[in-house]
Structure formats: structure tokens, C-alpha cells
Amino acid sequence: GQHWDWSHYFACARRVNDATRNRLAWLEMNSTPFPQFVGAPFSLYNDTNYMGNCGRSEKFPPIDRKIMRYAERGSRARRMMAKEYRHRAIVWGVQPQYCIDMLNWMIHCWGIVPLTDMLSLVNTRMIADTDTPENREQAFYDMAWLNENMIMRNRTHGGYKVLVDELWEFCETMNADMIMMWEHMSCKALTGMHGQFAEQARERGIHLVWVCHD
């Protein structure tokens, strides 16, 4: 049988931390008046990197560095992807990957810039990435943490706080005045909170747009 390779595990853990640092940097950049990492690249790329890769491939860090250079260059130049940003939006709910181009339509047709999405808001803390006896023990807790905070599970499992309350915190952090809410007709976890989202958005003066799909 195969033996567990701690050297390989911690090499992967370092790449996971690298991806986490980049994700946090992109979120911070998107909280400014000139967001650079938006739309399908944020959602699809983060989904693939977190769920499909999770540090296993050595190809991702060089790609991340290249993306970061482009994003930083655009931020310094204050580049915009539309002539005018009418609204800054958080994209919430379970998105349809097959029509992800709607994020581009939001920018180019309506001037709504999607700052981040629910499925991309996954792990934000560093895991142990140095091979020591203590970290070998910590690794099991880190792997459990990454599974607990996987896409969808970290929002639809954990109750009201992670699904509703934290949405308003993200709106404040990202300076968002709109929520584009994917309403997956088969996803009962979010459908059951329909009234709560609508009521609390009205109280906060945040525009809430429901986009139905299945």
C-alpha cells in the first residue's frame, strides 16, 4: 500500500496558504473603488483552486503571481471594466456555473460590478505548513477545517449567522450596495430564508435582486 508522505503534504499546505493569501489580497483590492478581480475569474478560478486543486498542483502559484501582477497594475492605473459603476454587488446563493457569463453582463450591460460571490468565500486562515511533530498533529485539524469550510457547506450548514448575518458584514467590508441573489429552485437551504433576506435588505437600504435558475 501507499505510505503517507508528510513532505508532500506540507508542500501542498504551503500552496494552500499561498492561494489563501492571494484570495484575501484580491478581496481587499475589490473593496476599493477600483476592483480588478471580478466576474467569472473570481468565482470559477477560486472554485477550481480550492476544491479541485487544494495545493496539489505546482502549476497554480506561478499563475497566481501572474494574475496578481495584472491586478496590481490595473489597480495602480485605476482601471475600470465599464464606463460607470452604478452599483457594487455581492453575488450570493448557489450560482449556475453554466451561465456564469451573467457576471460579465452585469458589468457591461448594467454597470453592476460583482465584487465577490458566496462560493468563493471559503477558508481565510493559514494552516500549518512546516513539518514538525506538533504540525503533524495539527494537520488533521487543518484538513477537517478545510472540509468544514468547503464551497456551499460553509454557508448552507451552520445556520443563520453564516448565511444571513455574515452577508451584511461582507456588504459593509466590500462597500457593496447591492446583492445579486442566485435563487436555485432546488436549493431549499436558501429558499427557506427568502423573506429574511428581503426584509433585512430593505432595512439596510441595500438593493436585492433575485435571479432564478435550476
Residue locations for each model-derived region?
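A short, acidic, amphipathic alpha-helical segment used as a generic capping/interface helix at domain edges
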Residues: 158-175, 192-196
